[in-house]
Amino acid sequence: MISFAPFLSPEAIKHLQENERYSDQSQKRTAQQIEAIYTSGQNILVSASAGSGKTFVMVERILDKILRGVSIDRLFISTFTVKAATELRERIENKLYSQIAQTTDFQMKVYLTEQLQSLCQADIGTMDAFAQKVVSRYGYSIGISSQFRIMQDKAEQDVLKQEVFSKLFSEFMNQKEAPVFRALVKNFSGNCKDTSAFRELVYTCYSFSQSTENPKIWLQENFLSAAKTYQRLEDIPDHDIELLLLAMQDTANQLRDVTDMEDYGQLTKAGSRSAKYTKHLTIIEKLSDWVRDFKCLYGKAGLDRLIRDVTDLIPSGNDVTVSKVKYPVFKTLHQKLKQFRHLETILMYQKDCFPLLEQLQDFVLVFSEAYLAVKIQESAFEFSDIAHFAIKILEENTDIRQSYQQHYHEVMVDEYQDNNHMQERLLTLLSNGHNRFMVGDIKQSIYRFRQADPQIFNQKFRDYQKKPEQGKVILLKENFRSQSEVLNVSNAVFSHLMDESVGDVSYDEQHQLIAGSHAQTVPYLDRRAQLLLYNSDKDDGNAPSDSEGISFSEVTIVAKEIIKLHNDKGVPFEDITLLVSSRTRNDIISHTFNQYGIPIVTDGGQQNYLKSVEVMVMLDTLRTINNPRNDYALVALLRSPMFAFDEDDLARIALQKDNELDKDCLYDKIQRAVIGRGAHPELIHDTLLGKLNVFLKTLKSWRRYAKLGSLYDLIWKIFNDRFYFDFVASQAKAEQAQANLYALALRANQFEKSGYKGLYRFIKMIDKVLETQNDLADVEVAAPKQAVNLMTIHKSKGLQFPYVFILNCDKRFSMTDIHKSFILNRQHGIGIKYLADIKGLLGETTLNSVKVSMETLPYQLNKQELRLATLSEQMRLLYVAMTRAEKKVYFIGKASKSKSQDITDPKKLGKLLPLALREQLLTFQDWLLAIADIFSTEDLYFDVRFIEDSDLTQESVGRLQTPQLLNPDDLKDNRQSETIARALDMLEAVSQLNANYEAAIHLPTVRTPSQLKATYEPLLEPIGVDIIEKSSRSLSDFTLPHFSKKAKVEASHIGSALHQLMQVLPLSKPINQQTLLDALRGIDSNEEVKTALDLKKIESFFCDTSLGQFFQTYQKHLYREAPFAILKLDPISQEEYVLRGIIDAYFLFDDHIVLVDYKTDKYKQPIELKKRYQQQLELYAEALTQTYKLPVTKRYLVLMGGGKPEIVEV
């Protein structure tokens, strides 16, 4: 029986914190980390700043729970993504392996091994995955079959929605309240024939409701909340009046700052106050008085009077000019007044739209129920449906809910700031009320588009601080990722930018970043942050037509800095990352980097497969085969590299029109041109005629084949007939292009296997996907490791990079949502723009109607909240981007240097940029420049630098210095002549040709797996064929003379030494350098070979990888360097031979075998060696299975030829 240690008391935790503080460990845990790891028995909210080690804390807390007797399956651990869950599971697995290796207690070893085995069944995953488990198990309790599937295909969802919508639309158009419903549709679509805008409204309302904890209740009780509440001027929320008063006071303060300027001119030459100064003083005094005494002078009932008074008081313009510099003092106040000025008129008509909203509410409710009924009938659901089913199961079944609450010792949540209300409800139901552990950072909440609500985190933070009995807040402020240059600039920017009004959190001492180690505080002057702006004063039109995209000059600035980093400081490309706000409009980056020879890889995930050039060419080829009279597709095929017709050729063909026909397609003109019966046969010269004959002959053969063969075979026939697959291999991004073409054939094959046959149906399916603005995901290829990374800010979250470039800082934030005809809000419900008929108000008699689009009061309230929420999320996006950097951060943008000016005088301002200014500025660049202008007297830890065209010439940018790949001392490598190389190639070719006909004659009695492995390498290598040795006789060997003076250690000798070392290495001892050196003395190799072995890499394998720890944990089951022999049949000669070899290592268990093989080959990508040795490991597995009659369940390659050991499962 194991005696587990109890959980630590608060006193014991304090004692542990003291011990850690004075320990001599190189890496110490902070007091807050220790508190977060060991505190138990209450709800805990961990506010973990960027780089503070929150994942480390979670893993350590889980391990501590396990060591104190809490089984892993009694912990509920929620992660935001499947990838995060996998990484967390792997970290826990590694910790358990390490703990097993360190533990001497046998019973504890058994217990930890059981935890290791339970890890794969533990509840570590996304909320969606857990909800599926609940519904699969208990769905019967609410009438849901356990045999359901998830509708992940958006196209399938859209088809079902459209069917439901069309049916309901017809019903509502023929009901009793049809006139009101028609008015509703016209308000959004303009007429009842085009229902697309109204349909989009319904779909959006439905999707929004699905993110709430109970969609039906939200639609019934909250959907019309603001429409029912805000019907009079007195109903305006206090918060909105406060914003108006704040804008008035800000205006007074800014005006006072301007009047205090030295050049303002308060006095006339006679010494009296100037008229301008007197007027401005009156404005300042009255605005301040009205703000201070608002309740006494006006109150809510007099709000309209206040608006009139302020409008009459301030000038109609926005600016105050001092010394020819304009200061937009009144701009924000004018914007606020505009919101309130027409409220009386709006409120007069707003009541007319309420019946329309009731109709909309009814329609969305019925649509939701009907859509769900269809999905239940199909037994196919969306993720949100499954989550709501899980909530319903737990709410309606007390026994099920209590069983979960009793089962889970703790409910743990990672990335808590990105939860939505549906997920929060599910977590509440799983918890017993005092066992929640939540980790997150509100400053990194960037998933509002997924309905994530950072206020859930914020409310918990406030509640726990005010009422400690509800839970404990632990702040992890220390950053262990970034140097002080990054931390300082982050603190400087956000202390001036972020507060609860914009950003949802006050960036005070509680949230500022602190260096976690002394090494991070060592200053590096060359790592100071840079805001590099291309001066657009003389912009020569290098920017794309869409001004939101990044310009060529901006990318050139980035290329110049990267070349400087790489050449001058030796920074590897993989240490550099470019962050962008979206995946679109980034082609210019790849194009420019290719020009400068800078390797770059993107984060993937784009859906541009059907828009890639090579796929578009093939699709147009298939369209032409299907219908040659499709001129667009035919021209694309003719112009493609397969036939290479140029503009002159097409012009000559186009003139072969038949004058008797009104409509003449290009295909008919081609046929007439070939037989010389076109309108101008003299234009068809012999060369063109030959090309046309080849084209028609090829097209005819393809069309004939399309009727007989499969799509897959047709596509490969096209590749082979015109060598298109080979052609793209010579182009830029060849690997990606060939992968795309190969995937097209596979997708066509999959299409036919799904029951659909024929080229016509395949083309229709592709065209339908394109018509709906959808696409297929790009095919992933193994990206080069030594390359600059390009990814979105969202994708970068949770990652870290030495050097970070934040691109396109001048891109305006997307505000499209606040200009839609409707805006949804969780508390207020829906707000709409109402198309009111103001004919009566105007006294108009000649026109039937005068329609004006009015922003109703609920719409205005939702719009203001949405605007602030959008700006807040953009601010948090900037925080995430900046805190990815370890060493240095760059901001890249574009601005006019001549138009750059001071925004306001720095005197008398607080720590933050004025709220009005923060709302007004709509780019990262604007925020940074405003901070630099207003707080110029402070050290902001970043420099602003304008880049001119003269700085971006080819000479100024420079070029990459190519490293010397060969050792200059190795004269043999340098002086091997091309003649000898060609001779060797010829000999190899002769040998291969002979070998093709000598299989049976020279079949050896015995072969090795290494020999057989080479049979499969031709399938992996793009050029050349490598034939295995067929005979035991020695072949002629032309030995080259050794020009080098110094002997090299052969790679094969190093491989042999490694295998010997792994065979004799004692696994019962801790694996360290001393253990390895002791074992190394016992192997039979010369000193040069022993010295060449990388012992640190071997130590890293055993200490840092789960497979290495597996070796030590299960050493009793391990067999090393085991010989084998089996009988095999030669496929060519049909003769039997003996296959002999030695297996590096395998683990023999009662019911299965785990196979391991070490490789010291050099490689660029692990996938290369996986393909190369896959067949060899299959032979080993076959031998083991024949011997032990047990399956080989796992096969691993241990790759020692790279920078670090890598484990590849084959």
Swiss-Prot record:
Residues 512-798 form the UvrD-like helicase C-terminal domain. ATP binds at residues 48-55. Its cofactor is Mg(2+). It catalyses: Couples ATP hydrolysis with the unwinding of duplex DNA by translocating in the 3'-5' direction; ATP + H2O = ADP + phosphate + H(+). One of its GO terms (biological process) is double-strand break repair via homologous recombination. It holds the Pfam family PDDEXK_1. Gene3D superfamilies: 3.90.320.10, P-loop containing nucleotide triphosphate hydrolases, PCRA, domain 4. One of its GO terms (cellular component) is cytosol. Keywords: ATP-binding, DNA damage, DNA repair, DNA-binding, Exonuclease, Helicase, Hydrolase, Isomerase, Nuclease, Nucleotide-binding. Its EC number is 3.1.-.-, 5.6.2.4. InterPro entries: AddA, DNA_helicase_UvrD-like_C, DNA_helicase_UvrD/REP, P-loop_NTPase, PDDEXK-like_dom_sf, PDDEXK_AddAB-type, Restrct_endonuc-II-like, UvrD-like_ATP-bd. SUPFAM superfamilies: P-loop containing nucleoside triphosphate hydrolases, Restriction endonuclease-like. One of its GO terms (molecular function) is ATP binding. HAMAP family: AddA. Belongs to the helicase family. AddA subfamily. The heterodimer acts as both an ATP-dependent DNA helicase and an ATP-dependent, dual-direction single-stranded exonuclease. Recognizes the chi site generating a DNA molecule suitable for the initiation of homologous recombination. The AddA nuclease domain is required for chi fragment generation; this subunit has the helicase and 3' -> 5' nuclease activities. PANTHER family: ATP-DEPENDENT HELICASE_NUCLEASE SUBUNIT A, UVRD / RECB / PCRA DNA HELICASE FAMILY MEMBER. Heterodimer of AddA and AddB/RexB. This is ATP-dependent helicase/nuclease subunit A.
